[in-house]
């Protein structure tokens, strides 16, 4: 499978990229800093590092050409300003979806977060407070960005992991259709390594397009 990865140098993104390469997939990492990507990921016969900005529609479309799936593991820096108010995804996601789908990619996996949008209906009271107070700026940005790309929904799979940790993964991670989730206790946490596994599982099945997962 040919995978275009956005956010390949992030803490979750590089884990995903390594796992995809270990499974024998061909990966194109579209990155702002190619030197950082090479240092972090190393050279690999199935890895192509393409430098480019997320707002460079022409370059992103070129990188998307011939890919089976796009996986976005983008995230903004956790600064006080971002927590209060953010437009990071609103400014980028519409451009990304237009460029990628315009190049013929029919499956786009987006890493979102548990508690974003309608997923908050299944959250516990403590988790709802986290979503509406602590993470308000970032989560509101994601919701507004999603509203800007509804025309691409048939192509999109969203993953909604809980609070990410840097602990070793447990393995054997399962993904669930978000529509089947009724209630989750406490504040869910998951290792980034397990999230990377889940994202790859979702990406490998094109029939997952149009479905949200937990």
Each predicted region: which residue ranges?
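Conserved beta-loop-beta element that borders a ligand/cofactor-binding pocket
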Residues: 146-168
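N-terminal Rossmann NAD(P)H-binding glycine-rich loop of SDR-like oxidoreductase domains
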Residues: 3-25
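Conserved Rossmann-fold NAD(P)-dependent oxidoreductase catalytic core, especially the SDR/UDP-sugar
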Residues: 26-28, 34, 91-137
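Glycine/proline-rich active-site loop of Rossmann-fold NAD(P)-dependent oxidoreductases
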Residues: 168-175, 202-211
